[in-house]
Amino acid sequence: MASVHESLYFNPMMTNGVVHANVFGIKDWVTPYKIAVLVLLNEMSRTGEGAVSLMERRRLNQLLLPLLQGPDITLSKLYKLIEESCPQLANSVQIRIKLMAEGELKDMEQFFDDLSDSFSGTEPEVHKTSVVGLFLRHMILAYSKLSFSQVFKLYTALQQYFQNGEKKTVEDADMELTSRDEGERKMEKEELDVSVREEEVSCSGPLSQKQAEFFLSQQASLLKNDETKALTPASLQKELNNLLKFNPDFAEAHYLSYLNNLRVQDVFSSTHSLLHYFDRLILTGAESKSNGEEGYGRSLRYAALNLAALHCRFGHYQQAELALQEAIRIAQESNDHVCLQHCLSWLYVLGQKRSDSYVLLEHSVKKAVHFGLPYLASLGIQSLVQQRAFAGKTANKLMDALKDSDLLHWKHSLSELIDISIAQKTAIWRLYGRSTMALQQAQMLLSMNSLEAVNAGVQQNNTESFAVALCHLAELHAEQGCFAAASEVLKHLKERFPPNSQHAQLWMLCDQKIQFDRAMNDGKYHLADSLVTGITALNSIEGVYRKAVVLQAQNQMSEAHKLLQKLLVHCQKLKNTEMVISVLLSVAELYWRSSSPTIALPMLLQALALSKEYRLQYLASETVLNLAFAQLILGIPEQALSLLHMAIEPILADGAILDKGRAMFLVAKCQVASAASYDQPKKAEALEAAIENLNEAKNYFAKVDCKERIRDVVYFQARLYHTLGKTQERNRCAMLFRQLHQELPSHGVPLINHL
C-alpha cells in the first residue's frame, strides 16, 4: 500500500485530464474548471465598478465561495450560474475562455503570467491572505510546478472541457426553442448554494483537499439535517470510493462512508468503514500530534464506544456490551471522564429494561452536569422523563423536568434537543390521553424555525423529531375523521422522508395503522387482514394485536383468544403497560361477545387498576366505558349510567370520533334499559333523550365512515320510533337499515353484545 501512496502523491500524474501537483506540498491542482473560475475572477477585477451594479456584484461575491470550495462542475452549468448573477460578465467569461481554448498554448501561458499582476501595486486588486488571494496563489504555484508535457495535457483537457460545454449549451438552446418553460429557467435557491448533485460529481475529477473537505462536510450536514438533499447512497459511496482511491488515509471519508452505510442498514460495510476511520485517525497522527500518546488511546476508546453504539443500533446487544466494556476499561486507564460519561449513557440504553436502570440514569445526569456536558445531561433528563412517564408519574412533575431541560437547550443553543423535547411532550400528552395538548405541541414544533443554518430557504431540519411530530399529527387527524388532512400530512411525510431514509419507518407504520383503522371501520376485514403483515414487519407487537382484532371481528373467537393470551404474557414481560391494557380490553370483549360477561369483569378491573396506577387517563375512561357496558349486559343499567357520567367527559373532550360515538350509543342503550321501569310519560321522555343521543352517535360514526355501527344505530332508532308511535321516522330509519344491511355482511352477533 505504501508504494501506491508514493506513486500517487510524489509523482505528479494525469488522470482524466486532471494534472496533480504534490499533494503533501500544495494539496491542490489545476483543472480546466479552475481555469474557468480564474477567468471569472480576472474578468471581475477588470470590470469597472460602474459596469456592474451593486446588486450584481453582491450576487457574484455570494457565488464565489461555493465555486472555490465545491467540486468541479460542467462549463454550461458554470455559465448558467454566472448568467443568473450577472449576464454581462457571463458573456465576457464565455468569450475569454473561447479565445483561450481555440487559440494556442501560449494564450494559457500568458493568462497565468498575468494573474500575478493582481497582487502588484500599492493597492492590489486582491489581498494575498484573502480567500480569493489564497486560491490565486495556490493555482499559480500549482501551475508553475508543472512540466511542459503536463502543461500540454492541461491545455488539451481545457479544449475538451470547452467543447463539451459548447455541445451542452447548443442542446439546451434547442430544448428551449421547442419547449420554453419559465419555471425551469428560474434558478432555485438551492442552486445558488451550488449544492452537490449527482451529475456534477460524475463530471468532476479527483477533488483537492479543500474540495474534499467541503464535499464531506456538506454531505455529512445533509445526512444529519435533510437526507433528501444528500446524494443517493450508491452515488455517495461511488464518490467516496473515488476519494479513497486517491487518498486511502483520508479518515473523514471513511467516517462518511460509515454514515452512508448506516442509511442502507449494511452492518458489515458500516463496521468496516468505522474501524478504518479510527485506524486512519491513528495512522495520520491527527490525534497523537496534538495530544502525544494520549491521542492514540483516545482514538482507541472512542472507537470501542462507537462500535458499541453501532452494534446497539442493529440490535446486537451482546456485542455492544463487550465493546462498551472495552471502552470503559481504556477510559478508566486514561482517566477520561467525558468518555466514561458517554459509556454510562450507553450502559443505560443497553440495560433500560432492568429495574435499577433509573438509578444508573440519575447518576449519569448528575455526573454530566458536574463535568459540564450539557448535551449528555439534557439527553439524560429526557430519558429519565420518558422512563418516569411509563412508570406513571404525574404530568406536572414530568413537564417541570422538561422545563429544566429546555433551559439547558436554550442556554447552549442545542436546537436538536429543543426539537426532541417538544416531540417528547407531544408523545407524553398522547400517552396520557390529552389529544388537544398533544396537537398543540406538535404544531408548535412544526411552526418553529431551526436555530442551525440548513440551506437557503429551508427553515427546518428533517430530523426524527419532525417525523415523530408529523406522525402524531396524522394520527390525531385520522382519529377525528379528518382523513383528507391526514393524507396530506402523510404525503408531506413521504416527500420529506423518502422510503429509503432512516426515519421512513415511522410514517410507514403510521400510514399502515390509519389504513387498518379505516378498513375496520368500513367492515372490510379482508383488507385489514392484508395490512397486518406490513404492520408486523414494522412493529411485531402492534401487528399481533391487530391480527387478533381482525380475528375477533371475523368471529374467530378461539384463535383471537389464543393470540391475545400469548401477547398478554409477552407484554407483561416487557412491561408494555399501554398494550397490556389494550389486550385486557380486547379479551374482555371476547368474553361478553361469547355471552360470558361475568368472566370479563376481572379483566376490566385489572385494566382499570393499571390505567389508574400509570395515570393513563384516556385508557382509564375507555375501561370504565367497557365496565358500564358489562353492567348493562348484567342487567343493572342504572349503575352503568352513573359509571358513564364518570368516563364520558374525557372521551368527549379528547377522545377519537369512534370512541365518542360508542360512548353516546352506550348512553342511549342505558337510557332505554333504565326506562323500562318508568311510568309512561317519563318513559317517553327518556326514549326521546335516547334518540337524541343516537343521532349524535350516528353523526360521529358517519365522520369515520363506520357503516356497521350506523346500521346498529338506525336499527335501534327504528325500534324506539316504533315504541313512540312515530311511523314516518320509523320507516325512514328502517329503509336506511335495510340498505346498509344489504350492503354489509351480518355476523349474527346480538346488538346488546356489541359495544
UniProtKB/Swiss-Prot annotation:
Pfam families: ANAPC5, Apc5_N. GO terms for cellular component: anaphase-promoting complex; cytosol; nucleoplasm; nucleus; spindle. It is found in: Nucleus; Cytoplasm, Cytoskeleton, Spindle. Changing Q617H: In a breast cancer sample; somatic mutation. The modification Phosphoserine is found at S195. One of its GO terms (molecular function) is protein phosphatase binding. Component of the anaphase promoting complex/cyclosome (APC/C), a cell cycle-regulated E3 ubiquitin ligase that controls progression through mitosis and the G1 phase of the cell cycle. The APC/C complex acts by mediating ubiquitination and subsequent degradation of target proteins: it mainly mediates the formation of 'Lys-11'-linked polyubiquitin chains and, to a lower extent, the formation of 'Lys-48'- and 'Lys-63'-linked polyubiquitin chains. The APC/C complex catalyzes assembly of branched 'Lys-11'-/'Lys-48'-linked branched ubiquitin chains on target proteins. Belongs to the APC5 family. This is Anaphase-promoting complex subunit 5. It comes from Homo sapiens (Human).
